[in-house]
């Protein structure tokens, strides 16, 4: 048996060799499968990528509620969770029966660490190293952007991405400044007045979890005359394997910021 520590410093003991992994986070499931892992035996109903592979993997509930019977039936040797995506109660419940590795991703560097960690846990280290290298090189080729940008993810109330979040770290890596980090909380509720005071150059309206679309432009544009309203694909702000697609995505939408 091997003793390891997860991203929260929790100690767990796992068996050596191939694992039977249940992933409770969509970005983690996608990354494991994109790395070529054959170890994933269970996923949440929200783990929908890569589509051609996940449909053959058993569903064990959602990210906030789990089907314990389905999990026990799969006889996993390792469960991988994520601090923000899954609840403490889920982790504690499952940890009474199985090793549960909890990942934590709050920065771009954390995302690279996640890929490396998954490579180790699923015995696909070489693929993980290669993916990290490819992502870093692709991002390095992007022209630097600049300006104040707020990423709006919810409506009624409006909620924005704030401090100590992967999305803010990604925006900063691209060259933006996120003034919402001055507010309390990681995903603070914001008003139009808050956005006005932030002196924004860009308002990024995400496609998820709330599906902002063109019809919502009028809620912002008349009140933020100096800011450009840009609709962005929320899936491109996932961490893990999706970062490679994200780098290409940001390259294709460069003109929207000019």
Give, region by region, the residue ranges found by the protein language model.
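N-terminal ligand-binding lobe of clamshell/alpha-beta domains
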Residues: 1-258
